[in-house]
């Protein structure tokens, strides 16, 4: 797998959805579908899989995302949609994603900078190079082969740090 790193290709959108949509997304992600099967065998975290099978995420929300991104992803195909959840001390591991393009959305309605849990991007020498703070209603988009990980929330945070992930495949050139 060829990794890539272009700091300028990382896009951050704040206040992405209107409040009612943000609240609805968070409500959907409060359902009892979470399981402790995300990550690797030696580093488990909370995971809600199979959201690409739900019309709300795969059609309704994806159309809203595409429109807000001026159609940039309109012709992309959804490979997977899922949510990751981390509690205090559950740190992600640096990794690239499958597919061509990754969208991460942060639905938690509130977040304090002291709770940490930021998104870390790693350069081609595997050194942390860019930090994107976890912030409610923020969307982060980047090429899938960009190495990244979610830092652990601090011990001062007693909830679940949620990220909603869309894995997309680019259209084939004819």
Can you say where each PLM-predicted feature lies in the sequence?
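Non-heme Fe(II)/2-oxoglutarate
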Residues: 1-79, 86
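Catalytic core of non-heme Fe(II) oxygenases with the double-stranded beta-helix
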Residues: 59, 63-174
């Amino acid at each position: 797998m060829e990794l890539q790193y272009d700091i300028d290709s990382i896009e951050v959108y704040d206040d992405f959805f209107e409040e009612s949509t943000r609240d609805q997304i968070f409500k959907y992600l409060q359902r009892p579908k979470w399981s402790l099967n995300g990550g690797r065998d030696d580093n488990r975290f909370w995971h809600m899989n199979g959201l690409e099978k739900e019309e709300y995420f795969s059609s309704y929300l994806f159309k809203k995302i595409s429109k807000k991104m001026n159609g940039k992803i309109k012709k992309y195909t959804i490979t997977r949609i899922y949510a990751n959840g981390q509690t205090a001390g559950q740190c992600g591991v640096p990794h690239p994603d499958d597919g061509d393009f990754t969208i991460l959305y942060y639905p938690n309605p509130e977040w304090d900078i002291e709770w940490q849990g930021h998104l870390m991007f790693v350069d081609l020498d595997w050194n942390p190079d860019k930090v994107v703070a976890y912030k409610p209603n923020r969307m982060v988009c980047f090429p899938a082969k960009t190495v990244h990980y979610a830092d652990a929330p601090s011990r001062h945070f007693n909830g679940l740090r949620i990220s909603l992930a869309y894995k997309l495949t680019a259209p084939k050139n004819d």
